[in-house]
């Protein structure tokens, strides 16, 4: 994309995987530190307020320039040894603040470690700026130490990539990168960008120079507050239809407002930030089969907000040939390619209203009564368990969430989706890495969210997810400690696979040991000892009463609440829940 009112740029030093290019200004002989200062000034003028730095020599000019800006109170610097953790920390900062966050690495494998965070940022439309330091052109391809092909390293995962030669000004490339990261170009959603900055020696300032006297930076809490929107009631002349509103990840409060205005049942995933209000239905994924083809009141239409990612019943609903569906898409999104989904994309709420119609009182009441009966049946089954279970832990964490809540992938977010009672009003801002739904980087993401939003933050995750990013617990001496509670559901392995087809294979006996080893991945890690090693507080609970007491404590600094559970009976527990809910819902529908 050429900038408006400008001639087509010279793109010889740049790549275009994200459909946006801009040249580096020719300024031969510009010193490394001078170029770095220009890059930092443009980044900060463009709204970057947080930069995560991983140490390295080739990136030293940027590190020194950032140190100067930090001393002047212009930017918050965080230092992380592990680049993968640094990338996800920056991702969390961008999520919590809604502004671009940057991560700086040296050359070589350091850059490659950012790939998981970049991929997540791409599919989740998060403005993540990769600042990768590189060798100058004359050292590339010569076998020079820590030198590889870094330009275009992230390929189609980034909106924009620029290779900025040593000795040239990075100004225009950085400006274009900021525009691409924040979604300023038409038809491009926000997302990650790569600015590959080549530096030539000398890489350090003169020893005689010193940092300016430090200025305390004014800090403001910029995290999102849970919102409630209001829309005008649906016009009376709209036809009555058996429509449901499905709020997927990142749907936002507009989904709740639309369902309320149109008198329609709301089926909301936890990370939709729409799982509240009078129209929200409880364990909705267990209800869908009762409103299918051949039922007394089959669903006719689906209005989709956000991205549905969590359950097969929802995927089956959207795939039904007897249902018409529409997707509210006012701006470009990153999670699907145009024309690749069956929903009708609609850009404005007026067209969506015409499509959805309005729900009759009987239609909404049926869903609410069925949801209430299902929630009661589920709670009854879960309460019969003497020890803590995934659903009981998820329900407690959901009810006690304040400030910010991050839900880990795998079973954590699905347990909340199943057992989390919709609230009358939103209590916390909910986050989840649903771009690619990986388990990596969850602790680091939570740390970034907590430090960016400056609010108490809770993260719910399983033990495998926790161990995958245990290095995210490492904070250097003097680094800011977030107010972060980490709730670890520890069942000594990967429980989610027992709820998939693999659980049936395991029960068959012949492949039992293989399933446990390959998918269950059992371990005997002492999480308390791990917490001690990283200087993080730890408590161990095994009952819902113990967890409720732990969740009632204020969040000050970092703490781990480990909840021991047994995954061997998880498949049977979910079967009992499904049977109890099915019977309860059938009873409600029979009376309608």
Which stretches of residues belong to each language-model region?
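N-terminal cofactor/phosphate-binding cores enriched in small/glycine residues
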Residues: 29-119, 419
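Glycine-rich, anion-gripping cofactor-binding loops and their flanking helix/strand elements
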Residues: 91, 95, 106-107, 113, ...
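A short, small-residue-rich loop immediately preceding and capping a beta-strand
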Residues: 49-53, 74-78, 96-135, 299-306, ...
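Thiamine diphosphate
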Residues: 120, 131, 138-151, 415-592
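Active-site diphosphate/adenylate-binding microenvironment
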Residues: 36-39, 57-63, 366-454
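Glycine/aspartate-rich loop-and-adjacent alpha/beta segment that forms the canonical ThDP
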Residues: 3-6, 10, 14-16, 152, ...
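Glycine-rich, acidic loop regions that bind phosphate or pyrophosphate groups
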Residues: 121, 132-177, 268-375, 476, ...
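Phosphate/pyrophosphate-binding active-site segments
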Residues: 16-30, 306, 315-413, 533-549, ...
């Amino acid at each position: 994309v050429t900038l408006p009112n400008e001639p087509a740029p010279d793109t010889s030093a740049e790549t275009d995987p994200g459909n946006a290019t801009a040249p580096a200004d020719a300024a031969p002989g510009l010193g490394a530190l001078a170029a770095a200062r220009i890059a930092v000034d443009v980044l900060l003028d463009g709204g970057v307020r947080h930069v995560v730095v991983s140490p390295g020599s080739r990136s030293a000019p940027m590190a020194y320039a950032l140190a100067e800006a930090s001393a002047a109170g212009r930017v918050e610097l965080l230092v992380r040894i592990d680049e993968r953790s640094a990338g996800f920390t920056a991702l969390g900062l961008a999520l919590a603040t809604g502004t671009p966050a940057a991560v700086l690495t040296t050359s070589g494998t350091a850059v490659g470690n950012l790939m998981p965070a970049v991929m997540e940022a791409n599919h989740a439309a998060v403005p993540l700026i990769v600042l990768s330091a590189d060798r100058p052109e004359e050292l590339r391809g010569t076998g020079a130490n820590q030198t590889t092909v870094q330009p275009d390293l992230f390929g189609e995962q980034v909106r924009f990539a620029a290779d900025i030669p040593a000795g040239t000004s990075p100004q225009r490339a950085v400006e274009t990168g900021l525009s691409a990261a924040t979604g300023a170009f038409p038809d491009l959603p926000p997302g990650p960008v790569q600015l590959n900055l080549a530096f030539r020696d000398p890489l350090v300032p003169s020893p005689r120079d010193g940092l300016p006297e430090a200025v305390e930076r004014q800090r403001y809490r910029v995290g999102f507050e849970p919102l409630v929107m209001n829309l005008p009631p649906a016009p009376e002349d709209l036809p009555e239809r058996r429509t449901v509103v499905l709020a997927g990840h990142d749907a936002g409060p507009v989904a709740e407002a639309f369902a309320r205005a149109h008198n329609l049942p709301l089926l909301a995933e936890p990370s939709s930030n729409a799982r509240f209000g009078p129209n929200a239905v409880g364990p909705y994924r267990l209800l869908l089969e009762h409103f299918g083809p051949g039922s007394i009141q089959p669903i006719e239409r689906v209005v989709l907000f956000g991205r549905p990612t969590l359950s097969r019943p929802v995927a089956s609903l959207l795939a039904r040939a007897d249902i018409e569906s529409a997707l509210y898409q006012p701006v470009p999104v990153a999670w699907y390619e145009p024309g690749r989904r069956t929903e009708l994309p609609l850009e404005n709420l007026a067209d969506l209203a015409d499509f959805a119609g309005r729900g009759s009182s009987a239609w909404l009441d049926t869903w609410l009564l069925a949801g209430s009966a299902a929630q009661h049946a589920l709670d009854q089954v879960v309460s019969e368990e003497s020890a803590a279970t995934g659903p009981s832990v998820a329900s407690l964490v959901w009810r006690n969430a304040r400030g910010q809540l991050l839900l880990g992938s795998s079973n954590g977010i699905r347990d909340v989706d199943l057992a989390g009672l919709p609230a009358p009003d939103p209590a916390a801002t909910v986050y989840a890495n649903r771009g690619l739904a990986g388990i990596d980087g969850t602790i680091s993401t939570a740390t970034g969210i907590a430090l960016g939003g400056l609010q108490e933050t809770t993260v719910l995750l399983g033990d495998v997810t926790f161990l995958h990013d245990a290095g995210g617990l490492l904070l250097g001496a003097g680094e800011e400690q977030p107010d972060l509670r980490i709730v670890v559901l520890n069942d000594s392995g990967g429980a989610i696979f027992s709820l998939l087809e693999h659980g049936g294979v395991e029960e068959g006996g012949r492949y039992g040991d293989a399933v446990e080893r390959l998918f269950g991945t059992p371990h005997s890690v002492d999480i308390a000892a791990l917490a001690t090693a990283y200087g993080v507080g730890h408590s161990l609970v095994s009952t819902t009463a113990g967890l409720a007491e732990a969740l009632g404590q204020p969040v000050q600094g970092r703490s781990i609440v480990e909840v021991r559970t047994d995954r061997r009976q998880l498949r049977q527990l979910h079967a009992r829940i499904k049977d109890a809910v099915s019977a309860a819902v059938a009873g409600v529908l029979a009376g309608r």
